[in-house]
Amino acid sequence: TRLIGLEGISLYMLIFPTFSLFMSLSQFSLPTSVSKLVSEDKYNNKNLVFSSIPIILIFDLILIAIILLSASFISINLLKDSRCYLPILCISCVLPFEAMSNMLRGYFFGKQKMLPHVISHIIEQIVRLVLTIMLVPTLIKIDLVYAVSFLILVNMISEFTSIIILLIFMPKHIKITHQDIKPQRNNIKNILSISIPNTNTRLIGNIGYFLEPILLTSGMLAAGYDISYITLEYGIVAGYSMPLLLLPGFFTGAI
């Protein structure tokens, strides 16, 4: 917030619900499914993990195409701010890395190994903070939109770092063969039986969150307010007030 200012954080928070929706869709709750099935230890764990990766990547490619085609419509017609266009395009770069990272985390959660997740998460956050502190001040001098876009793209770099760390923690004796990557019908059936209900449940909240800034901007524009004023006020609520309000949820979630 101190690096990009009120206007920057307001623009970022205007885009964030769209970011969250596509992130939820990109994972399709497959990490949760893999975690549960790995913990049961009844299946070929290698096939569960590595056969799911091509599926989730194909699904992400479809989402990337949707983002590329709809970014202009979302930014101009829904969010009413053309500056959102480039940051929304940047979301497409993050999806495969986020999905891969969470898939590997799901494997370790299923094995009840928390250390890989903890270490990868700490390093991921360090990378994100260092890159943000180093590059955002330079980018904001060029254009605020570039700085906000980088805040989206930095997730791609940090998630890639996390993937490398998680792969280091994978058992060294594992040899991935063609059969491990080839989807098995029973495994896919079991994975989808868990992921589809979970995704449907999460989508209800994500769609509501996605519609929040759209309805707010449309309503306030109809009431005669300027888009700059709306963006700043939404940024104050979503970027300052709500994080403080939801802070206690961190402790209950940890339990």
Kindly give the residue locations of the regions a language model identified:
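Alpha-helical transmembrane segments of multi-pass membrane proteins
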Residues: D81-M103, I152-L153, V237
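Interfacial transmembrane-helix starts/ends
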Residues: M13, N44-I58, I188-L192, A238
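Membrane-interface junctions at transmembrane-helix termini in multi-pass inner-membrane proteins
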Residues: F97-S120
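Small-residue-rich midsections of specific transmembrane alpha-helices
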Residues: M13-V38, C93-M100, I207-L211, A238-I255
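Hydrophobic alpha-helical transmembrane segments
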Residues: I119-M134, I142-K172, T201
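Short membrane-interface helical motifs at transmembrane helix boundaries
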Residues: I62-S82
